[in-house]
């Protein structure tokens, strides 16, 4: 399975084309829209979310609620485009109009300046429009298709916020994926411990008044994953590496870890490694899950536990200093519509990205043209693993 996305933040629409989804997967626009609503929610979201009410249109690859095995095309209209029709026009317009909303004061931490240098733009809006987090709308849409496939294989996935603005959430031990999903869904900031809810929301309000932004850390957990996804035989076939690439490809994400992650650097091997057990009923298991469900770049049957860190949003309402690319004079950076934080919403994006990587690897290992064949292949593999 592979996909491409297209579209600008203030253009007419966003598009994704997905290839390789087996025929016979139940899929509806309502299911995708529910995921898009999750992305638009979360405490701390700003004005753009009041303008946009994302609704997907499926224009190919699905008929009568079932995928057809052909490329799936998803479109989401940008409602705000009506205010940007000339500014974002594909057709040439007069120079006077081109100067409207021209961006020449790049924002520190954003793609504005480097994108302008790379593609030789005199108007840095060209960098801003495609590099905007608005593109994550389609990452969620694509991820919802992947999640639908995982559900059919009884693979569950959930995400929650574990750190927001430096405030750490006390996460109860041994929560199931279903419990994480339920608890996070009841929180405006996607935390599983309500004791932190008001403290974090108050801090978000404070940050907004300051004209500042905050980042955080998100954890995604996947249960029911078959043993042996990924491979050790080549570097690029290691599944944890593929997930790491996917997570860090999300706008503003700067790091990723699995299981104990960076704590491994402070611990002894006798503590970190997960001891192996065997029983006739369950086959091979691990006593712990310090490695986050991976050994040798392959899934080992334990839940996948992956965390990603998101930096604070670079657009500040009290902007930092920058330089005008036309005059080379120091100026405060440009201000675009922004939020004090998007970490809760980014949890939905990360969940979709991890689901997409997993679905892709499943289809690589259990290559199937239709869902019936796929389910049979996975079931046969699971039987072999249990009897190994």
Curated annotation (Swiss-Prot):
List of residues binding FMN: 130-132, 251-252, 296, 311-315, 337
Q: What is its EC number?
A: 4.2.3.5
Q: Name one GO molecular function term.
A: chorismate synthase activity
| Cofactor info, note text | Reduced FMN (FMNH(2)).
Biological pathway: Metabolic intermediate biosynthesis; chorismate biosynthesis; chorismate from D-erythrose 4-phosphate and phosphoenolpyruvate: step 7/7
* Cysteine-cysteine disulfides: none
Keywords of the record, alphabetical order, are: Amino-acid biosynthesis, Aromatic amino acid biosynthesis, FAD, Flavoprotein, FMN, Lyase, NADP
Q: List the cofactors.
A: FMNH2
Q: Which Pfam families match?
A: Chorismate_synt
- Quaternary state and interactors: Homotetramer.
- NCBIfam families xref list: aroC (TIGR00033), PRK05382.1 (NF003793)
Listed name of the protein? Chorismate synthase
Organism per entry: Streptococcus mutans serotype c (strain ATCC 700610 / UA159)
Lineage of source species? Bacteria, Bacillati, Bacillota, Bacilli, Lactobacillales
